[in-house]
C-alpha cells in the first residue's frame, strides 16, 4: 500500500486506539461501532475486510486521502517475543498524518508476524528490512504509529499497549502486561493443540478477583469449546 506522510496534527488521539483482547482486533478509529465503519466505505478508499476475505481494514477519506480507520485482525497472529532491536527506530519516530497515495481500492494485509513484548509493553508488526536512513515510524497518536518502508505501509507499533486493552467495550482495565502475556501464551497453546489447560489455570488465578476480565475470559473459553 503506497502512502505519504505530512507533518501535521492528526485528529485521532490515544482514546481512539483500542485493543479488543478477546475479540482479537485492534481498532484505530473515531468510530465506536462496526456498522459506522461499514457505512463509511461509501466515501472511503483503501482496503476493507469484506465477508469471507482476510484483508485488514485500512481506510482513507476519498476527498483528501487522509487516514481515517484501521481495523487489524490479530487472531492467531500474535507471538510473545522481544522488541529490543526495534526500540531505537520507535524512539526516533515522528508525529504526523498518513495519506493514501493510490487511486483505487486494494487488498491489503499486514505482516502475519505480530509481537507482544511484555517487558516493553509493546504490540507491533515490524520488518527487519527497515532502514534508518529512509524509513520511519509515523505516530498518528502518542502511542500508535505506522511503519513506513520505501513509501509503503508495512507495519505498525502500539506503545503502552496494556493501557489500550478493551474488555466488553471498557478500556484501560488495569490489566498488567504479564497477565496479557499469560493469556496470549495460553491462547496460543489452545490454537496449536486445542489444549485448554493453560486457559483454565489462568481462569482459576483470576477467579478470586472476579470482575470484567474474569467474566470475559470465562465467556471466551465457553465460545472455544
Residue ranges and their predicted role:
Residues 39-53, 130-143:
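A cross-kingdom feature marking solvent-exposed beta-strand/loop segments within repeated
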Residues 133, 139-145, 160-177:
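Conserved mixed alpha/beta catalytic, RNA-binding, or beta-rich assembly cores of soluble enzyme
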Residues 56, 112, 142-144:
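Generic beta-strand structural signal
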Residues 1-49, 58-59, 69-125, 164-225:
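Intrinsic disorder/low-complexity detector
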Amino acid at each position: 500500500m503506497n502512502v505519504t506522510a505530512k507533518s501535521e496534527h492528526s485528529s485521532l488521539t490515544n482514546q481512539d486506539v483500542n485493543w479488543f483482547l478477546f475479540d482479537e482486533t485492534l481498532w484505530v478509529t473515531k468510530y465506536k461501532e462496526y456498522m459506522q465503519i461499514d457505512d463509511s466505505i461509501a466515501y472511503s478508499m483503501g482496503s476493507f475486510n469484506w465477508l469471507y476475505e482476510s484483508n485488514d481494514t485500512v481506510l482513507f477519506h476519498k476527498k483528501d486521502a487522509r487516514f481515517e480507520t484501521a481495523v487489524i485482525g490479530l487472531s492467531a497472529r500474535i507471538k510473545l517475543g522481544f522488541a529490543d532491536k526495534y526500540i531505537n527506530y520507535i524512539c526516533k519516530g515522528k508525529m504526523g498524518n498518513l495519506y493514501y497515495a493510490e487511486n483505487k481500492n486494494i487488498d491489503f494485509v499486514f505482516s502475519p508476524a505480530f509481537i507482544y513484548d511484555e517487558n516493553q509493553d509493546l504490540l507491533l508488526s515490524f520488518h527487519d528490512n527497515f532502514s534508518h536512513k529512509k524509513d520511519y515510524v509515523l505516530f498518528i497518536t502518542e502511542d500508535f504509529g505506522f511503519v513506513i518502508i520505501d513509501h509503503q505501509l508495512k507495519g505498525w507499533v502500539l506503545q503502552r499497549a496494556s493501557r489500550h486493552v478493551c474488555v466488553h467495550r471498557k478500556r484501560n482495565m488495569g490489566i498488567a502486561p504479564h497477565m496479557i502475556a499469560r493469556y496470549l501464551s495460553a491462547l496460543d497453546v489452545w490454537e496449536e493443540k486445542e489444549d485448554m489447560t493453560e486457559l483454565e489455570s489462568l481462569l482459576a488465578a483470576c477467579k478470586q478477583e472476579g470482575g470484567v476480565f474474569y467474566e470475559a475470559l470465562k465467556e471466551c473459553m465457553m465460545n472455544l469449546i
